Curated annotation (Swiss-Prot):
MF (Gene Ontology): FAD binding; UDP-N-acetylmuramate dehydrogenase activity
Highest taxon above the source species: Bacteria
Listed HAMAP family: MurB (MF_00037)
Catalytic activity: UDP-N-acetyl-alpha-D-muramate + NADP(+) = UDP-N-acetyl-3-O-(1-carboxyvinyl)-alpha-D-glucosamine + NADPH + H(+)
Signal peptide positions on this chain: none
Assigned keywords, A-Z: Cell cycle, Cell division, Cell shape, Cell wall biogenesis/degradation, Cytoplasm, FAD, Flavoprotein, NADP, Oxidoreductase, Peptidoglycan synthesis
Pfam families to which the protein is assigned, alphabetical: FAD_binding_4, MurB_C
GO terms for biological process, alphabetical: cell division; cell wall organization; peptidoglycan biosynthetic process; regulation of cell shape
Taxon lineage: Bacteria, Pseudomonadati, Pseudomonadota, Gammaproteobacteria, Moraxellales
Protein name, UniProt field: UDP-N-acetylenolpyruvoylglucosamine reductase
Subcellular location: Cytoplasm
Any single Gene Ontology cellular-component annotation: cytosol
Length: 353
């Protein structure tokens, strides 16, 4: 039975099932749960957690997290809405977006408004507030390129603040929010988008699909089509999208790999390093379409781990660690998981522990 406690606008619930709120569909119960729609709600929730000596786990779209069966912590579920135009000129428009907005819906909205920049990131699961955390990226675009600033509640200073894109330290699947996960709760993200067409068509299959119809809408539609053809729908096949990061190796390491495996897909980076396609490594290690019990790597895209039937976190860990082992044996590369791993106290845990 739920026990509900009401504050000014916020409600705390006990023993709440989080299965609908994580895209891997893990069976998870939170000892304490609340949905927040404002900064005031966040302040009340944090005060409750402090009073009851609870850790805080901030839940966004649940598309990049691995959760245990029981979480003894306060889960704060972000639901801050709103899309507000701050300013615009001939070339740019600045838009402030609530952290609880669905990411894909926001991308569709920008295209409808004829704003450019985010079309390559269509159909990425999750909410706007999670996009800066791991600097989401796809088809040659990272969200950090179009973020002007991130609005936060700073738990250390106990106040709201704004962090410029430069101070977010965006890099491949990384940001300051990963370095200090317990400090900031993202409330809004301010984007600086283009008003003139500037389509990023760096990826071969995307360039070919877009063809001569160089509109934002066509680019977005082709990205959606390609993703849907390769990636499983989480409602049908529970997953967290790309499970592993594409490893980045130095020149010496790359020369060793290319000498042994001449067809290895790779992408040169600005600093002389080389990004390797993790999906190809997993496929070559024999894991594409392979299952270990109720968890496996998807048959159309080896980079996606799928929960086929009521898997537990232990089942998931057993599978991804087996994939890591086999890839390392073949290529001497240790794959790093993308989703964040939590323990039963709601704290982030290292995947290697």
């Amino acid at each position: 039975m739920f026990k509900n406690r009401f504050f000014n606008t916020m409600q705390i619930q006990n023993q709440v099932q989080l299965k609908p709120f994580n895209t891997l569909s893990l069976d998870v119960t939170a000892s304490h749960y609340t949905k927040v729609k404002s900064i005031e709600d966040i302040e009340e929730a944090l005060a409750f957690a402090k009073e009851h000596e609870l850790n805080v786990l901030v839940l966004s779209g649940g598309s990049n997290m691995l959760l245990p069966q029981q979480i003894n912590a306060l889960v704060i579920h972000l639901d801050i809405q709103g899309i507000d135009v701050l300013s615009e000129d001939q070339d740019f428009i600045r838009v402030k977006v609530g952290a609880g907005q669905v990411w894909h819906d926001f991308v569709l909205y920008t295209t409808k408004q004829n704003w450019f920049g985010l079309q390559n990131l269509a159909l990425i699961p999750g909410l706007v507030g999670a996009s800066p955390v791991q600097n989401i990226g796809a088809y040659g675009v990272e969200v950090g390129e179009f973020i002007e600033s991130v609005q936060v509640y700073d738990r250390l200073l106990k106040q709201t603040g704004s962090i410029s894109a430069a101070d977010c330290h965006f890099s491949y699947r990384h940001s300051i929010f990963k370095d200090e996960p317990a400090r900031y709760i993202i409330t809004h993200v301010t984007f600086k988008l283009l008003k003139q067409a500037n389509l990023k068509l760096n990826y071969g299959d995307l360039k070919q699909a877009v063809g001569d119809n160089l509109t934002a809408e066509n680019l977005q539609n082709q990205v959606i089509h390609i993703r849907q053809s390769k990636l499983p729908d989480p409602k049908e096949y529970p997953n967290v999208g790309s499970f592993f990061k594409n490893p980045i190796v130095n020149t010496q390491e790359f020369e060793r790999l290319i000498a042994q495996f001449s067809t290895i897909p790779h992408y040169p980076q600005a600093n002389g390093n080389v990004k390797i396609a993790a999906g190809w490594l997993i496929d070559q290690a024999g894991w594409k379409g392979k299952q270990l019990g109720v968890v496996g790597m998807f048959h159309k895209q080896a980079l996606v781990l799928v929960n086929y039937a009521n898997a537990s976190l232990a089942d998931v860990k057993k599978t991804y660690q087996a994939v890591q082992h086999d890839v390392e044996q073949r290529f001497q590369i240790m794959l790093e998981p993308e989703p964040v791993l939590y323990n039963n106290l709601g704290l982030i845990e290292n995947h290697t522990e």
